UniProtKB/Swiss-Prot annotation:
Entries under CDD domains matching the protein: KH-II_30S_S3
Gene3D superfamilies: 3.30.300.20, Ribosomal protein S3, C-terminal domain (3.30.1140.32)
Protein name, as recorded: Small ribosomal subunit protein uS3c
Ranges for domain KH type-2: 43-139
GO molecular function: rRNA binding; structural constituent of ribosome
Pfam families: Ribosomal_S3_C
Gene Ontology biological process: translation
Domain of life: Eukaryota
Localisation: Plastid, Chloroplast
GO cellular component: chloroplast; cytosolic small ribosomal subunit
Family the UniProt entry places it in: Belongs to the universal ribosomal protein uS3 family.
Cited InterPro entries: KH_dom-like_a/b, KH_sf_prok-type, Ribosomal_S3_C_sf, Ribosomal_uS3_bac-typ, Ribosomal_uS3_C, Ribosomal_uS3_CS
Species the sequence originates in: Lolium perenne
Span list, region Disordered: 50-80
Amino acid sequence: MGQKINPLGFRLGTTQKHHSFWFAQPKNYSEGLQEDKKIRDCIKNYIQKNRKKSSNRKLESDSSSEVITHNRKNDSGSSSEVITRIEIQKEIDTIHVIIHIGFPNLLKKKGAIEELEKDLQKEIHSVNQRLNISIEKVKEPYREPNILAEYIAFQLKNRVSFRKAMKKAMELTKKADIKGVKVKIAGRLGGKEIARAECIKKGRLPLQTIRAKIDYCCYPIRTIYGVLGVKIWIFVDEE
């Protein structure tokens, strides 16, 4: 049996880097990890909550059915607002949080960063440390596996065929400068009683080469037939 390893952890220190940068005493290390998880969960919940509010406002404000259907079609682009990664850098008196996101439309609104900072302060109860949040826009959104996985999830929840959703995601990668991509979906595909896996691959994908920069994500999708698992590998470049 072949033993599968996470492509990101396999390349940690060569082509991949840590998302948290800080030092702590051994007795305080677990508290630092829990604080990082609270920060990341709070930011993701804030994005999801505000995205739902903005989509509901659009549907309520548009009276004609033509405009409503047009907005629903455009919601497929909301997958680009997915957070690709959150980097946390801790100093003695400051916590720097860098949010990497596709198109930061929600966080660019007036007062959004201040509101997010207040939520984080309540969550982590940091009295002696101040928060510094910055937004980094991803240059090539469709080179990020998290964004492609969210796009596939949106298509499947709208009852689009899984094969069609996979092909559309592969087409989006043509806009990005990559050398290979692999998309795999497993579960009760199409509502079938027996679970199976479908896979599409394009280009090169040297998983055994450590110097190859490969981005990877595993994303669960909850449907009426159960949970589907989406895995995406993207071969960016070779160092």
